[in-house]
Amino acid sequence: MTTLASSIEHKTKHLAAPFENDENPWMKKYCCQCKSCKMSVPVQPWLPRFFVFGILCPVFWLVNLLAWWFLQYWQPHELEFHDLQEDEYPGFYEYEAITKRTVIPIKEEVLQEIRVMQNFSDSNSEEYYESKDGMPSSFLNVNTEQVEDENDTLKKYRYAFLKKVAHDVLESHDLLRKTFRDWNLRSLLGLLIDSILIIFVVLLCKKSR
């Protein structure tokens, strides 16, 4: 019986719909597609390393500053959104999966948007809030018996999904620029301190003569 149960559980995991796992469009993280962000992503992990190397060789601080200027200002850095294909939008299958699973985790901003739209359509949704790994998450519960027009409801979910995508893109763009700014301000501060120390040493040498 134990072997049979484990076999059934194993098959069940393989039969699980993609929406219920990692391909859930509500869980996917969308990033800015501007040229600046695309070029900055592979460079980002090197910023703290170059800062540490700069303590021994200040040239690395200059490299950080040049990369900051070239990637964050010289390159086009206007927000660009992910080109969503039709099959990437939550459809009827995803909507049914939501109602069957009762709850799905979504961002607080998206939950607020859906709540406002549902108030306009006189539908009564119940919101559940749970915590995962110590971080609060928002959950949406939709009762299909209270929805009269499926097409209208699907449009509302898609609109909320677009709001979520826009939020993700803006957040990723701002976070990447903030990371570059923080590390390069540290590099600039290191160069200033080194310059002051060099000037101080030169003045001391002149006085000693």
UniProtKB/Swiss-Prot annotation:
Topology, Lumenal side: 1-49, 206-209
GO CC terms in record: endomembrane system; plasma membrane
Modified residues (Phosphoserine): S121, S123, S125
Induction line: Induced by alpha-pheromone. Repressed by the ALPHA2-MCM1 repressor.
Topology relative to the membrane: Multi-pass membrane protein
Coiled coil: none
Keywords: Membrane, Phosphoprotein, Transmembrane, Transmembrane helix
Localization in the cell: Endomembrane system
Modified residues (Phosphothreonine): T153
GO annotation, biological process: conjugation with cellular fusion
Transmembrane feature ranges: 50-70, 185-205
Cytoplasmic side: 71-184
Domain of life: Eukaryota
Its job: Required for receptor inhibition of inappropriately expressed a-factor receptor (STE3) in MAT a cells. Inhibits signaling by relocalizing the G protein beta-gamma (STE4-STE18) subunit to intracellular membranes. May also be a mechanism for the down-regulation of the mating pheromone response after the zygotic fusion event, promoting the transition of the new diploid cell to vegetative growth.
Protein name as catalogued: Protein ASG7
Species of provenance: Saccharomyces cerevisiae (strain ATCC 204508 / S288c) (Baker's yeast)
Annotated gene: ASG7
